[in-house]
Amino acid sequence: MDFSLSEERKMLQETVARFFESNYQNINKRNENVNLPEGFCKNFWKESAELGIISALVSPKFGGLGGDGDDISIIFELIGKSLCVEPFLASGVLSSTILSSVSNPNLDLINQIVEGKLLIAFAHTEMNNRYEDSFIENSASLKDNKWCLNGTKSFVINGDTANKVIVSARIDGDVNDKAGIGLFLVDNDQIKNRSYNTVDGYRASELIFDTAKAELIARDNEALSCIIKANSAGALALSAEALGIMETCFNLTLDYLKTRNQFGKSIGSFQSIQHRMVDMMLEIEQVKSAVMLASSTYRSDEKTRDRNISAAKNLVGRVGKLVAEETIQLHGDRKSVV
């Protein structure tokens, strides 16, 4: 199987890499963006839209230029390398995936996302929810022929800066029923928002709905299918982002080992350290292969797609921890080498 990128995707990769490198030169620039009122740089987001980076996350059927697994993984691997904090995940992947998967897609909203004019967040996680996509306690009911939502959503990425939020809520049935689920579009002014910074610099929110007016965009099997697809797309994006972070950590550590001297020679010349670096490189290569497989089967049937994305996510969790521990330790004690 040929996993080499097409000429178009090579151009996308090179363009995005140059753009991120010029705007995220170092960690100080990232910290500046994190500390802005929105938690990210609006100008950078606008320029991303103008360059077609957001568009590359959306299918041509809905006004985009890409939207395949390879497009997602290319962009998010580079996001990981630059530690970019703009809302590519919340608006560019999660929300656009749902809006383009419903039976009556709102092309105007999707186009506004692609153009960088509209931010939409996806609110699905709840306090009592673990890993079941269908477990939903938030409720939706009709009042004067209009849908109203009640309940609380947790850990909503970019929920405080979004113009609108896509919300999952239960129309009927028990909290873990696969039927009776609805997806709703809610304006930000209908929501009580408690925002906070996450440990990695992103902005998340707890959203409270108290008879919030909402527009139904999908229900029952269609709604659940959209939720599953969005979560799969998000898992692929985050797996690729983690791969980019691992590669950067490895390269920074390799440079350090070449320049750090101890006992009259660079510590990278010690065989025990070389073995640790080789082991780490092999693990990262396995992650890269898993992400490539998940990307290549993103448009396959749901079972194949979710199996490969889950496998990549599982491997990322294990190897990511290993790489973090190893790179920190190899940057460690300046007094002696064991």
Where do the language-model regions lie?
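Alpha-helical interface subdomain recognition
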Residues: 1-83, 102-105, 112, 116-117, ...
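Conserved protein kinase catalytic domain
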Residues: 73-76, 96-99, 166, 185, ...
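N-terminal glycine-rich flavin-associated loop
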Residues: 84-105
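Short beta-strand-to-turn element immediately C-terminal to the catalytic PLP-Schiff-base lysine
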Residues: 99-103, 141, 167-170, 185-187, ...
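A short, Trp-centered hydrophobic/proline-enriched beta-strand micro-motif
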Residues: 116-127, 167
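Active-site-adjacent elements of ketosynthase-type condensing enzymes
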Residues: 128-139
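Flexible, small-/acidic-enriched active-site or ligand-binding loops
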Residues: 135-137, 155-156, 186-219
